[in-house]
Amino acid sequence: MANRIYNFNPGPAALPLSVLEEIKENFLDFQGSGMSITEISHRSRQFDDVVNDAVARTKRLLGLEDNFEVLFVQGGASLQFCMIPMNFLGPGRSADYVDTGTWSTKAIKEAELQGKSIQVVASSEDKNYSYIPKNIAFNEDADFVHLTSNNTIKGTQWAEFPDTRGVPIICDMSSDIMSRPLEVNRFGMMYAGAQKNIGPAGACLVIIRKDLLDWIPDTVPTMLKYSTFAAKNSMYNTPPCFAVYTVQLVLKWLEETIGGLEKMAGIN
């Protein structure tokens, strides 16, 4: 393509040209099915292979063990702001939140709207979110700590994640997921709206430690339970097939063309 524009939008963000070319080549006839990826059944073998490959590549790239589920959930990261307290802050549970900008502020608001027990233990609002708080006094009895890894609007990022004294971190990584290796065992959940870094809008990658699924109250509506997606390989209802397929191709590019997250971090 002669005049491809450099795209610095925060989302939908740029995608690798080779991924777009592969999509173009296979768009009308996906894997010899005679149908487009936008037409095939999400119950088909072809799409089942897409999901399973995306899950496997996510696990390899991040070094995830079998105690993590990899899910594709709709609603972007913004819906997760609502789902996280709904799923993990049942009666008797509490969480610490760190406020570092627009997206963490929205996550805090969604928890507060539900009347959940949360504490904002640190904030950089006093200087217009121009820094990442240090020396945070986390509550040892908190069930999780919520962070936003990269604050696109304010331009700050956690270069190193804080010591939470063993409390699992739940982290919005929408704009820097797959950009660097992570100490994944420190996290209870990582989530990322695909359109920021790994695909088009429509899918949210959710990586969740399996034991957290046991925290979910029975009263949470079916489509707002992470356990619903885990039990059905992200296909309880019709998923955003095209978005998931594109994410799969980006993960393939990261693994096979770039050579993994160490290499990606070096490029970045």
What are these regions (language model features)?
Residues 7-9, 70-74, 97, 119-122, ...:
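General beta-strand structural signal in soluble alpha/beta enzymes
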Residues 194-267:
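Active-site C-terminal subdomain of aminotransferase-like
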Residues 111, 123-177:
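Active-site phosphate-binding strand-loop segment of PLP-dependent enzymes
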Residues 89-105:
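Conserved PLP-anchoring active-site segment centered on the Schiff-base-forming lysine
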